[in-house]
């Protein structure tokens, strides 16, 4: 066997061993909602109409109290009628900036949902909160629909 053949066989064996090695399990923790009651990290809301005299309930923030390598967002539809939910998700940073990681309309069946992510942490930035925005003044069709949301930080 030539040196070149030996190297190819050796590299192939290393690559195969790496592919078959068990993956490091990711450890994730639910993040607490800002303004929550401390008993649950899963928030249930109904999309309300915006109004000029009060704040709509479109935004929900979740505290990030330690460094994580990535983040996940979870959404479940609770309405008995199929609806299209305008969904946005943001990583909010300690320097006041933010990064939009979700921007789509989602039409799940009742009781079903979706996970977005994992979204990696941004080098040189510290995440202070995750923000979920469900519904918007530009799309009033989702008004009245109920949903559950939660977020996780993972290492």
Question: Can you describe what each PLM-predicted range is?
Answer:
Residues 99-110:
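Solvent-exposed serine/threonine-rich low-complexity stretches and specific carbohydrate-binding patches
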Residues 9-19:
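Bacterial N-terminal signal peptides
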Residues 112-121:
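Exposed aromatic-hydrophobic patches
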Residues 73, 120-145:
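Noncatalytic modules at the cell exterior or secretory-pathway interfaces
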Residues 45-87:
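Short, surface-exposed binding/anchoring microloops in extracellular/periplasmic proteins
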Residues 1-10:
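Bacterial N-terminal signal peptides that target proteins for export
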Residues 19-27:
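Sec/Tat signal peptide C-region and signal peptidase I cleavage site
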């Amino acid at each position: 066997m030539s040196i070149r053949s030996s190297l190819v066989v050796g590299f192939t064996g290393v690559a195969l061993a790496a592919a078959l090695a068990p993956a490091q399990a990711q450890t994730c923790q639910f993040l607490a909602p800002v303004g929550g009651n401390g008993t649950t990290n899963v928030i249930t809301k109904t999309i309300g109409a915006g109004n000029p005299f009060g704040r709509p309930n479109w935004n929900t923030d979740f505290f990030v109290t330690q460094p994580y390598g990535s983040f996940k967002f979870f959404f479940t539809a609770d309405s008995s009628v199929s609806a299209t939910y305008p969904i946005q998700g943001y990583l909010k940073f300690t320097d006041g900036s933010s990064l939009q990681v979700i921007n789509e309309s989602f039409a799940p069946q009742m009781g079903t949902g979706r996970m977005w992510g994992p979204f990696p942490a941004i080098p040189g930035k510290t995440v202070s909160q995750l923000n979920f925005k469900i519904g918007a003044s530009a799309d009033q069709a989702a008004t009245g629909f109920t949903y559950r949301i939660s977020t996780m930080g993972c290492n």
